[in-house]
Design a protein with these regions (language model features):
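Secondary-structure end/capping motifs
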Residues: 231-305
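Short, solvent-exposed loop/beta-turn-alpha elements that line the ligand-binding surface or hinge
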Residues: 56, 110-113, 212-217, 281-290
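Solvent-exposed, polar/charged alpha-helical surfaces in well-ordered, non-transmembrane soluble domains
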Residues: 51-52, 74, 78, 92, ...
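Bacterial N-terminal signal peptides that target proteins for export
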Residues: 1-11
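Pocket-lining segment of extracytoplasmic ligand-binding domains
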Residues: 89, 168-169, 174-262
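Bacterial N-terminal signal peptides
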Residues: 9-21
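Short, glycine-/small- and polar/acidic-enriched structural segments
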Residues: 27-159, 167-170, 186-192, 207-208, ...
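Conserved C-terminal helix/tail region of periplasmic/extracytoplasmic solute-binding proteins
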Residues: 298-319
Length: 319
């Protein structure tokens, strides 16, 4: 009898340990490697990191920095990262080439009217006074397979200019001022925080806000993309990631003054530059119809070989 009671106590103890440890095991953080860029649209991601919102969702994020979305996507294909930020032009081009991608969250959308977080800049004393002076000139782009280039081409067409009359070259955002000084480019294309830095610190002049002047409506610009193969086995990772971002977006909307302080910290910028930053609209949900406007124009411009149905790229967390 005594032995029986001892066995029962041991069994009860094991059951109790399982009950107590079960939730802890279930709540163990999931881990994801995330490709990030040195740009203001990263603010919700960085905010979710700093405030522990991903951690509260049971997600451990491991960021890896890339120059641009077109560079980050190959890292996604090579499984160097699980999730990466990229513009929809690069995503659509890769999808058309056979890349099995899914969008799990949006990033930013442009405004329908200036000012906006994307500009063509020229030197303060440049003889380029308007967009109509750009034919024959060379424009620098962070990456050529980008929504920035697509938008600039649209601006040119809206002004009656053949996009082929302008030369496009790749120059990383941080190097465009030097390239301009050396004369290898006559105009820059930048987004924030480079836009504010070049205008407010270095005296460059805004020639055009290429998103609203190109598309005339608000369009989604970029967001978070994964491989379909990865998503099939990590839907919970995607859900927690999108939820952490959404909480960060809501926090930033409710605390605009805090947002500027966070940008100053995240991007190591002086207050003068941070105060001049134009912030585009954050949105975890993606306007598929707006993105389709851009992608359809790319077919006409030759940047896409045929129609890409953007809605088919969206995972439930981005709809």
């Amino acid at each position: 009898m005594r032995q029986t009671r001892l066995i029962l106590r041991l069994v009860a103890g094991i059951v109790l340990l399982v009950v107590l440890d079960g939730p802890a095991l279930a709540q163990a953080p999931l881990s994801v490697k995330v490709g990030v860029l040195p740009i203001v649209p990263m603010t919700p991601f960085r905010t979710a990191e700093k405030l522990g919102l991903f951690k509260e969702e049971g997600l451990e994020v491991k960021p890896e920095m890339f120059q641009g979305g077109a560079v980050a996507l190959p890292a996604l294909l090579n499984k160097q990262v699980d999730i990466t930020y990229s513009n929809w032009v690069s995503v659509a081009q890769l999808a058309q080439q056979g890349g099995k991608l899914k969008v799990i969250a949006g990033g930013t959308a442009s405004w329908s009217k200036p000012p906006d977080a994307g500009t063509i800049l020229v030197g303060r004393d440049s003889d380029i006074k308007s967009v109509k002076d750009l034919p024959g000139k060379t424009i620098g782009f962070n990456t050529l397979r980008s929504i920035e280039r697509a938008s600039v081409m649209q601006v040119l067409k809206n002004n009656g200019i053949d996009p082929a009359s302008v030369k496009y070259v790749e120059v990383p955002w941080p190097n465009q001022a030097d390239a301009h000084k050396q004369g290898s480019i006559q105009a820059l294309t930048v987004i924030e925080p480079f836009q504010s830095r070049y205008v407010n610190q270095m005296g460059f002049r805004v020639l055009a806000y290429f998103y609203p002047e190109g598309w005339k409506v608000s369009v989604p610009l970029a967001g978070w993309t994964v491989m379909q193969e990865w998503l099939a086995e990590h839907k919970e990772h995607a859900r927690r990631f999108a939820r952490g971002l959404e909480r960060a977006v809501q926090y930033l909307r409710q605390n605009p003054a805090e947002e500027r302080k966070l940008m100053e910290e995240f991007f190591k910028l002086p207050k003068l530059v941070v105060d001049g930053i134009v912030v585009n609209d954050y949105s975890v949900k993606v306007d598929a119809a707006g993105a389709q406007i851009v992608l359809d124009a790319l077919v006409e411009d030759g940047m896409l070989k045929g129609k890409v149905n953007f809605a088919e790229l969206l995972h439930d967390t981005a709809k």
